[in-house]
Amino acid sequence: MNMRWQLKYFRALAALLVAASEALAQEMRPVARRIVVSIPDRKLALVEDGRAVKIYPVAVGAAHTPSPAGSFTVIVRVAHPTWYGPGKVVPPGKSNPLGPRWIGLSRKGYGIHGTSNPRSIGRPASHGCIRMHNADVEELFARVAIGDAVEFYAERTDEVARVFGM
């Protein structure tokens, strides 16, 4: 093998390795993911890398038990949760008010969950949590992780308009 051919081979191999490592780094890059809830619009958006990839209808807190505005973090994810209410415990199943999934937030007692009352979706009907159709919360649950940011907006801000395309 002559020296000139070896040098060309080495350069080609180096370029290939650089391209492959850049592609791998891009693939391994964590997705910047957050959940945005517009309380007045009763909608939840899953935002990845700055754009809404999915928008869901939700139920929000009723007038006497409003959903809190603010920034939170996902701190727990529970499949088939048990509901502990005043003097009552409801195991996982169709009559469980939390539905099939619970995404617990850093604000104690608040979360995003399914429902045993799908007719409440789109209304101010909860005790402050965000209720979703059961199939929707299962889909969201599969895509979010502990540590993801969650933002509840009580007003239609520029950010809400951007996320929800208003």
Q: How should these model regions be labeled?
A:
Residues 15-25:
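Hydrophobic h-region of N-terminal signal peptides that target proteins for export
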Residues 24-71, 76, 92, 100-103:
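Cell wall/extracellular polymer interaction/catalysis modules
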Residues 2, 26-32, 66-69, 81-82, ...:
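Exported/periplasmic cell-wall-interacting domains
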Residues 2-13:
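Bacterial N-terminal signal peptides that target proteins for export
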Residues 11, 41, 58, 74, ...:
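Intrinsically disordered, low-complexity regions enriched in small/polar residues
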